[in-house]
Amino acid sequence: VAFHVVGGGLAGLSAAVALASAPGGHDVVLHEAAPRAGGRCRSWHDTELDVEIDNGTHALLGANPQALAYLARIGAEDRVHWLDGGIEFLDLRDGARWSIRGPADMLRPWRHGGSGAAREMALLLRLLVPGQGAAVPPGLAGATGLGRLAWDPLVRSIMNTAPGIAAAVPFAAALRRILRGGARGMRVGLARRSLADCLVDPALHLLARHGARLRLGARLREVRGGADGAPPVLHFDGEAVELARHDRAILALPPWDLARCAPGLAPDCAASPIVNLHAVLDMPDTGAGDIAFRGLVGGQVEWVLRRGRVASSTTSAAEALSGLSRAELHARLWPDMARALGLPPGARALRWRTIVERRATPVQDASFEACRPGIATAAANVLLAGDWVVPGLPCTIEAAIASGVAAADAALRSARTARE
């Protein structure tokens, strides 16, 4: 039995790891179009900055059971730095500072009562059990009360879609899990060195130990067959892989890439961008263990992560910024980053660059949520994985890993049935 996983992002990596680790030993091949694995969680040595950077400031939460299980499976638990003091926030409008360590801190504004607090409580209660097709109420992202505390960056970072547009069902699922987890569920975990060092390289080492094959630069061009009993054929550059009756393929690709090579398997969905600013600071290199993380409200930047002298910012649902030039982006983002880092007015970075991930996720509105396909396809030996696949979960690291594990489990079960 051969298992072909197409796509080396976290969905594909988690699927390949689950397949390679399963009892009995299996022939697992991971095909990735890029020169490195990792997808949107990749890391690389940037020649402009002369340092290693990540493709964004991705973070884990204590309320991410699938991600935590993945870390344990690949032996990377010690590569995560957990913030013990909660999430620090800064309001760029008036300099107010606060931290959120658990659900009680998120509810702090309501202790003071008033009509605004009562309105926000009603909105939150309605959000926790939303109707199908509902959007996250924009009132939770206002300039006062709970909206000021955390909701706007929380909605945008989880959904990469603005409040008022973001589908309420997946956001509510993530929110319920966070609230149920208490203070432990809200702990933030950050890669100590890089996303690749934490989430990608240990998985590749596990796959190599189990004899799995990694094919980099292997772009899937087309999927033929699979209907009316015809065997599916995966067409890569210069190679075609025909799936035998008991073989299985997991297509762990973004929806726009899947739509290109296998029309009909992915919904037609708009993309939502994320903008990052990376900067090398004028300070001594204090090493990978020196990590700071802060949320911002009232500005252009939502999150700032600093590892040693390398700082990175994230702005989600960044349609308004994605068309700007590098210089314009720097002019908008650097002042926010500098304030978050406590730098003096007029401070400059030694080197900087901006990165616009134009297709970071789909726009996660109600119409997208309604057409997510799930992992099964019409062909018994072709399955799907990806953060966008499974209904009811936001497009996050947790969803990507969960979909990969679910697809691997389904592939193992169906392959076993086909052999019997």
Pin down the residues of each PLM region:
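Conserved flavin/dinucleotide-binding core of flavoenzymes
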Residues: S43-H45, R101-A104, W303-E420
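Glycine-rich FAD pyrophosphate-binding loop
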Residues: A20-T47
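Mobile amphipathic helical/loop "lid" adjacent to a hydrophobic cofactor/ligand pocket
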Residues: N64-R176, R180-G181, G185-M186
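Helical element adjacent to the flavin cofactor pocket in flavoenzyme catalytic cores
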Residues: R176-F236
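Glycine-rich active-site loop/strand segments that organize a redox cofactor
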Residues: G39-A63, R177
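Conserved Rossmann-like nucleotide-cofactor binding loop
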Residues: A11, R36, W256
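Mid-domain catalytic core of redox enzymes
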Residues: A218-G342, I355
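N-terminal Rossmann-like FAD-binding beta1-loop-alpha1 element of flavoenzymes
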Residues: A2-L30
